[in-house]
Amino acid sequence: MTNKTILVTGGAGYIGSHVVRQLGEAGENVVVLDDLSTGFRQAVLHGELVVGNTGDAECLAKLFARFDIDTVMHFAAHTVVPESVANPLKYYGNNTCASRTLLEHALKAGVQHVVFSSTAAVYGIPADGEASEDTPTAPINAYGTSKLMTEWMLRDVAAVNPLRYVALRYFNVAGSDPGGRIGQSTPKATLLTKVACEVVVGTRPYVSIFGTDYPTPDGTGVRDYIHVEDLADAHLKALAYLRRGGESTTLNCGYGRGYSVRELLAMVEHVAGHPINKREEPRRAGDPPTLVARAARIRAALGWQPQHDDLAKIVTTSLEWERKLAAGHWRS
């Protein structure tokens, strides 16, 4: 730990807020930059919240002048795959161009470390459905491409500047803070676990199964679900790695185990204790049939040891959070 400040962009959002909470619990100095378009003021449990956009050069200049920032954790982004297919320029503008502006100001301020929120969507459709960090990148939607372009920027900038980074490629994030303080609260979210749990508590009429004819055992898409608590811990481990002098690197964040849509929904029904309304729909644009992590490298590089690798635990914490939201116990 240092006396410097960590800037967390998008720190009022789902994943960012869990990282901010863990940073605060570790005694780190934190400032959050979030425009609150999908984040929530009350989700920021530690540090100061500055309301602003990552692509706003004037806002960034003031922020870097005010705080002694040596690390940036960059989460701020649009993340909805179907929307990125329908409106790609929105994603290139907010995800890629805004990241360029952020990097420019970070370099001017002498930032030494960046931990970047990337995505497994950069892999597109791997030949066998599994992806290691050496799997060729071939995104099939603008969301994945916008994140990959930011990875390229980081790579090229770090090659000629005293800045090192870790890019973490997330697989499917789910679950919520076991303490019940924060969780996925975005209205009209598309994350399957959240949608299914909303059906359980009655805030959504049904959950859609997009595609039942994939080349998978039960015909539905297969994904690697990672608990948000373990993902947040990976960011703290990445920061510790960089502080030890670790070289810039890119790492998968997943458990290395896949569950189909039907398997996940069966677990939701098991935890809820009753069936939920489901609707079979055509495939959704930009969705690969199977995407599972090969995740040995992150464990070796960072010493990361997941503590929540349990689908029942992921679903249980998700459902507990949705019940809290439905009861009105967490308001914006």
Residue ranges and their predicted role:
Residues 1-173:
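N-terminal Rossmann-like NAD(P)+-binding domain of SDR-like oxidoreductases, especially those catalyzing
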Residues 11, 39-41, 52, 82, ...:
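Glycine-centered small-residue hotspots that permit tight backbone geometry or close packing
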Residues 56, 174-176, 206, 215-216:
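Active-site/binding-pocket entry motifs
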Residues 81-84, 176-182, 217-219:
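A short acidic, helix-capping loop that chelates divalent metal ions and anchors anionic groups
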Residues 92, 140-148, 182-194, 224-225:
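Short-chain dehydrogenase/reductase
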Residues 163, 178-179, 205-209:
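Oxidoreductase cofactor-interface core, primarily capturing Rossmann-like NAD(P)-dependent enzymes
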Residues 193-195, 201-332:
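C-terminal substrate-binding subdomain of Rossmann-fold SDR/epimerase-dehydratase oxidoreductases
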